[in-house]
Amino acid sequence: MPLLGFAQAGAGGFFDDGGFPVGKGWDEIAFPAVSDEHAYALEISGDSMLPAYRRGDVIIVSPAAPIRRGDRVVVKTRDGEVMVKELARKTARSVELQSLNAAHADRTLPLRDVLWMARIVWASQ
């Protein structure tokens, strides 16, 4: 399964417009439990996702998995920002995202500003 450091995820060239991994710079880890051939791993860096995810934790992201309210998701904006949040609500016009860390603000984004959103299906905690 492709693996990328979370800090690198905002840089260009690692994802296509659908949120699928592309390009060079990806490492690999063995993870047989996910059936989505497009799933990939991100290694957490920093403390912005505490207490849910710690530095060094690995999350498995599935671009093909259906997303429901309450799911933890990776979101990439058209500005290139990549974030991990909990999906609070999605409408035809906007997406409301709840932060995992109380020190960071919740976000409401116009749907047109979201390039892609993919569900986190597993975490190494």
Model-derived segments and their meaning:
Residues A88-Q125:
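Glycine- and charge-enriched low-complexity intrinsically disordered segments
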Residues M1-R55, S94, W122-S124:
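Short, positionally conserved secondary-structure boundary motifs
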Residues T77-V84, D113-L115:
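Short coil-to-beta-strand transition motifs
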